[in-house]
Design a protein with these regions (language model features):
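Intrinsically disordered, low-complexity acidic/proline-/asparagine-rich linker or regulatory tail/stalk regions
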Residues: 196-205
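Short C-terminal beta-strand
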Residues: 182-190
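Short, charged/polar, Gly/Pro-enriched secondary-structure boundary elements
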Residues: 191-195
Length: 205
């Protein structure tokens, strides 16, 4: 295959990935989708990002047994985008983002928890920046663009949507270390069927 043909294939793949992303983004935000679908959209986002920045972001995803579960639509891309903008982009030489999903039992034994972790090996945050994020997440009011950057407001939106659907004990938890990276954990009940948004596990019924 010639260089020109290779470029044609690359452009075609970019157009397809962009088209699928646009189609996904313009749908109703309140939809529940499979976790695997969310991961696929994240892969396409990072693919398009790497086309622009010469492949400086390595994305890894692991969701053994959890891909079939349902999650609120558009909860992962804002977190992954945040990881790139604030973690990987300021770091020389690029970096990696790991998205993992696992089902864990709660101590009370009543519900199972889906925990999705987004980790990057970027520049990390100092305590002041981390405190600002924690303050934003803990607040009852939506983030104000003049006070917070728009990526953080995207994280706040995801956090609030999860809590609205499932309860205040769920949502986002953030930890970070300067020079090591940032970890964002999304916690929600296991949802095994579309439309099940009450935090109850129907397994075995």
């Amino acid at each position: 295959m010639t260089a020109l043909e290779n470029e044609d294939v690359r452009v075609s793949e970019m157009i397809e990935a962009l088209s699928q992303q646009i189609h996904y983004l313009i749908g109703p935000v309140q939809d529940m989708v499979s976790l695997e679908k969310e991961l696929d959209i994240v892969r396409k986002y990072v693919y398009l990002l790497n086309c622009r920045i010469d492949g400086k972001v390595q994305l890894m995803t692991e969701a053994p047994g959890a891909g079939r579960l349902f999650v609120p639509k558009l909860i992962l891309q804002p977190i992954v985008e945040n990881a790139y903008v604030h973690g990987i982009k300021p770091k020389k030489g690029g970096g990696s983002i790991m998205v993992e999903a696992a089902v864990n039992d709660r101590e009370d034994g009543e519900k199972r928890i889906l925990e999705i972790t987004v980790m990057d090996n970027g520049v990390g945050m100092d305590q002041a920046a981390l405190d600002q994020i924690q303050e934003l997440l803990a607040g009852d009011e939506p983030g104000i663009k003049n006070e917070y950057n728009w990526q953080s407001i995207g994280m706040k939106n995801v956090h609030d949507r999860i809590r609205l659907l499932y309860g205040e004990e769920y949502g986002i938890r953030v930890t970070s270390t300067v020079g090591v990276g940032t970890m964002v954990r999304l916690l929600m009940p296991v949802t095994e069927r579309e439309g099940q948004t009450d935090g109850k596990d129907d397994t075995g019924r």
